[in-house]
């Protein structure tokens, strides 16, 4: 998440204090500040209709609603590749670099109508990589749930996206997520990395133990030891294109 979300200059009180005409650079800086301010305002009330789980010693956790089994579309594609397309019979996923969908975090309301047109949408997947600052991992996990809950409250058909990092993250990673629900789990980018595969498998096992899902939408390569009897697999289109030289 390399994009700036808040710029202190937006409320630094300096507007109107200079007698000289502002330079083009100053005007540009102010415009950027106002845009940043708009982004903050666009998020300040999005959680008004979201329920929260109160957890001692933690911030309230957004509650994501349970999803019953339904007829799945045949194809799952990344947000950045389909958001401006008209094909509605798709499942939208956020399994791509954070920068490709950071705009959803910056201005969630803007994407309510575009996301509603699709058959279903798997919840956002902001990174929680090993080596990231612990607060950033927690924050990204929190916003993954918060945005999913927000879009559910707006009538978008959202699938809970289950994410984690290392075993320490289990203390919060699965909180607020529904039990006995359809869920989605991604494994993109870990095959061939034994440490990453080990951590993924441990988290997968814990997710199934805690959430006891009735159906798992799986994106990416099939991993050994999975519950294939309750899983439906979707191909990683980016990886497919890479393998085909496109």
Model-assigned labels for residue ranges:
Residues 2-129, 146:
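SEC14/CRAL-TRIO lipid-binding/transfer domains and related phosphoinositide-recognition modules
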Residues 80-87, 91-94, 102-244:
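Eukaryote-skewed repeat-based solenoidal scaffolds used as protein-protein interaction platforms
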């Amino acid at each position: 998440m390399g994009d700036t979300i808040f710029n202190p200059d937006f409320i630094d009180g300096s507007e109107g204090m200079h007698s000289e005409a502002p330079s083009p650079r100053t005007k540009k800086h102010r415009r950027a500040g106002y845009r940043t301010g708009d982004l903050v305002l666009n998020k300040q009330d999005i959680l008004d209709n979201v329920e929260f789980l109160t957890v001692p010693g933690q911030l309230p956790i957004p509650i994501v609603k349970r999803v019953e089994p339904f007829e799945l579309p045949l194809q799952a594609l990344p947000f950045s590749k389909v958001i401006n397309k008209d094909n509605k019979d798709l499942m939208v996923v956020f399994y791509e670099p954070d920068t490709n969908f950071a705009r959803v975090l910056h201005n969630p309301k803007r994407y309510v109508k575009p996301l509603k047109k699709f058959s279903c949408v798997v919840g956002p997947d902001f990174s929680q990589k090993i080596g990231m600052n612990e607060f950033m991992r927690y924050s990204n996990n929190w916003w993954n749930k918060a945005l999913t809950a927000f879009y559910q409250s707006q009538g978008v058909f959202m699938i809970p996206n289950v994410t984690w990092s290392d075993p320490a993250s289990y203390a919060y990673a699965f909180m607020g997520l529904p039990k006995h629900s359809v869920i989605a789990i991604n494994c993109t980018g870990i095959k061939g990395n034994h440490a990453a595969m080990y951590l993924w498998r441990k988290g997968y096992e814990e997710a199934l133990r805690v959430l006891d899902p009735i159906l798992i939408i799986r994106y990416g390569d099939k991993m050994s030891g999975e519950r294939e009897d309750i899983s439906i697999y979707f191909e990683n289109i980016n990886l497919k294109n890479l393998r085909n030289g496109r």
